[in-house]
Structure formats: C-alpha cells, structure tokens
C-alpha cells in the first residue's frame, strides 16, 4: 500500500542527468483525463499533483517520490506526471517541441516499469488514445508494462462498466470521486515496480 508521497522536481524537457534509484510509474493521457487527480487519490493527498484549469498551459514533467509498504517492508518508487496531450489551443510548433521532448523521455527513461495510460471511460476509442497505445508498444521492453486505466467511471452505470471491462479485460476502471478501483490499481503498481507481476 502507498503510505506517503512528496513532490521532487519538475522538468521542462528530458534530462539524462536526473537519474533514479527507484522504479518509476509514468502517467499518460489526454488533457483533463484526470492524471493529477488520480495521483492525488492514490497518494491520499489532495493537492500533491497540481492540475491546470487551462488544458495545455502547464507542460512540465513532474516527479513524486512515493513510499510504499508491502509485508511490513517499506520501499520507494517514483510517480511521473507527464503533460497531457491533445489540445487544440496551442501552436503546431509548440506541439512538435512537446512531442519531441516526451518521445525522448519515454524511450530513454529506463527506470520506468509501468506506463499507466488514462482514458476517459465515456470516450474509449479516440484516435489519439489508439495512437498512443501503438506508439508505446513499439519500444516497450520486457521489464515494462502498459496498463489502460479508464477514469470517471462514476459516470457509467453497471451495464456500461461491465461492457467496458469485457472489452478491455486487462484494464482497470477507476473513479477519483468515489475511490472505485484504486486498491486494485495500487496492487498492480506495487507488483509491477517490484518485478512481481509477470
């Protein structure tokens, strides 16, 4: 279980000198899909990860050191809150710079063990999400895993949840509002970063 967390630093772009002694979990998704809210819910801190009211305004890679406990043993991992993607209100040139920075970061950051791809449960087949999943698969290493996490599931009825889970069998459905699915997600994060989820 997660028992504590603190903010470490923010980066504008990939810095190969910022090494990590811990396994890392990267949170990716469209703007306003709920990345920061999910990190706050998992870490049980309301304002740990800050979300911007203006999509695309904050384009930083944010690092958080997370303390976990398993069988009385404590260990640390890093959560990485990546910039959201898919905004309409920024220039093409700025998008290209962001994409280049993220591409370099995701491919070269070998300490990342789990990519959590957040998808709005009401919009499950958007082209931008399909493209992200295909992109991650192209450079995924044997010690890495992609996990689809469908957010805002409190807005679905039971039938819609069952249909979604049936279509995406290895996914997790969560709601930051009523804390649905967070315990299951926490278990996967801990097992994957410890190398137990084979």
Swiss-Prot record:
Matches recorded under SUPFAM superfamilies: P-loop containing nucleoside triphosphate hydrolases
One GO molecular-function entry: GTP binding
Binding-site residues for Mg(2+), renumbered to this chain: 36, 58
Cofactor: Mg(2+)
The keyword Nucleotide-binding appears for this protein: yes
Residues covered by the EngB-type G domain: 21-195
UniProt source species: Campylobacter jejuni subsp. jejuni serotype O:23/36 (strain 81-176)
Protein name: Probable GTP-binding protein EngB
One of the protein's GO biological processes: division septum assembly
One Gene Ontology term, aspect cellular component: cytosol
Function: Necessary for normal cell division and for the maintenance of normal septation.
InterPro entries found in the cross-reference section: G_ENGB_dom (IPR030393), GTP-bd (IPR006073), GTP-bd_ribosome_bio_YsxC (IPR019987), P-loop_NTPase (IPR027417), Small_GTP-bd (IPR005225)
Keywords: Cell cycle, Cell division, GTP-binding, Magnesium, Metal-binding, Nucleotide-binding, Septation
């Amino acid at each position: 279980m997660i028992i504590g967390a603190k903010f470490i630093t923010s980066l504008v772009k990939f810095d190969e000198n910022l090494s990590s002694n811990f396994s890392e979990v990267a949170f990716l998704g469209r703007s306003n899909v709920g990345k920061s809210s999910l990190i706050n819910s998992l870490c049980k801190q309301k304002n740990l990860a800050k979300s911007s009211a203006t999509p695309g305004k904050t384009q930083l890679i944010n690092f958080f050191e997370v303390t976990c406990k398993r069988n009385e043993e404590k260990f640390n991992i890093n959560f990485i809150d990546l910039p959201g993607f898919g905004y309409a209100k920024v220039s093409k040139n700025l998008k290209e710079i962001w994409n280049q920075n993220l591409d370099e970061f995701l491919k070269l950051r070998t300490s990342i063990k789990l990519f959590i791809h957040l998808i709005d449960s009401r919009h499950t087949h958007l082209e931008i999400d399909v493209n992200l999943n295909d992109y991650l698969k192209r450079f995924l290493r044997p010690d890495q895993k992609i996990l689809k996490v469908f957010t805002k599931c409190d807005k679905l009825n039971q039938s819609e949840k069952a249909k979604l889970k049936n279509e995406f069998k290895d996914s997790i459905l969560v709601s930051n509002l009523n804390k649905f699915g967070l315990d299951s997600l926490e278990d996967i994060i801990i097992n994957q970063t410890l190398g137990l989820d084979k």
